[in-house]
């Protein structure tokens, strides 16, 4: 009986800690070394290092860098889509939603200029006449990704290469951070 009570207590403690976590932060697991006071210290265990992703994104915006990079294959496909588009710029809305095998999946949909929300992060590619409108709540999952395109018959289309993902689904459509 005491074991059951103890296990219930541990479960409640885990739930409370999960509810306290901040959705705007993540942890990086470093298996070999970590930095402490700018010194590299060897580590035999996994160490948690707090990373403020919103600050990274805000610094990126201030330095005029792109939140997401685009490969040559994706650039060529965007040029094709731009030719089919009736507007001056091709505008795609990028966001992350719950779903897929690993918990999160990307959504990329064409939108009109008046559908861009005020709090979206805008990434403009003038040479391609292309605007990427990134949902403000999704930007923490999209930061530092690479957009690629594949003509494969199976699982072809736009794909995201996410260096921040800790788990990926076999088909490559969903991920977890």
From Swiss-Prot:
InterPro entries: FeS_biogenesis, FeS_cluster_insertion, FeS_cluster_insertion_CS, HesB-like_dom_sf, ISCA_plant_cyanobact. Residues 1-18 form the signal peptide. Keywords: 4Fe-4S, Apicoplast, Iron, Iron-sulfur, Metal-binding, Plastid, Signal. One of its GO terms (biological process) is iron-sulfur cluster assembly. It is found in: Plastid, Apicoplast. GO terms for cellular component: apicoplast; cytoplasm. Its main location: plastid. Disulfide bonds: none annotated. The keyword Cell cycle does not apply. Pathway: Cofactor biosynthesis; iron-sulfur cluster biosynthesis. One of its GO terms (molecular function) is 2 iron, 2 sulfur cluster binding. The keyword Manganese does not apply. PROSITE patterns: HESB (PS01152). It holds the Pfam family Fe-S_biosyn. SUPFAM superfamilies: HesB-like domain (SSF89360). [4Fe-4S] cluster binds at residues 101, 169, 171. Homodimer. Homotetramer formation is observed in vitro. Participates in the sulfur mobilization (SUF) pathway for iron-sulfur (Fe-S) cluster biogenesis. Involved in the pre-assembly of [4Fe-4S] clusters and their transfer to target proteins. Belongs to the HesB/IscA family. This is Iron-sulfur cluster assembly protein SufA. The lineage of its organism: Eukaryota, Sar, Alveolata, Apicomplexa, Aconoidasida.
């Amino acid at each position: 009986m005491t074991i059951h009570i103890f296990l219930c207590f541990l479960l409640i403690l885990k739930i409370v800690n999960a509810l306290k976590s901040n959705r705007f932060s993540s942890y990086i697991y470093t298996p070999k070394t970590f930095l402490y006071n700018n010194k590299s210290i060897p580590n035999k265990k996994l160490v948690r290092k707090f990373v403020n992703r919103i600050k990274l994104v805000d610094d990126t915006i201030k330095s005029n860098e792109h939140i997401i990079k685009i490969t040559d294959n994706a650039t060529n496909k965007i040029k094709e889509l731009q030719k089919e588009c009736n507007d001056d710029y091709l505008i795609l809305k990028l966001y992350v939603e719950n779903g897929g095998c690993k918990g999160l999946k990307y959504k990329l949909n064409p939108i009109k200029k008046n559908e861009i929300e005020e709090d979206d992060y805008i990434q403009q590619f003038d040479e391609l006449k292309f605007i990427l409108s990134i949902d403000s709540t999704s930007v923490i999952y999209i930061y530092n990704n690479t957009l690629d395109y594949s003509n494969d018959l199976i699982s072809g289309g736009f794909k995201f290469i996410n260096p921040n993902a800790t788990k990926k689904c076999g088909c490559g459509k969903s991920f977890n951070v």
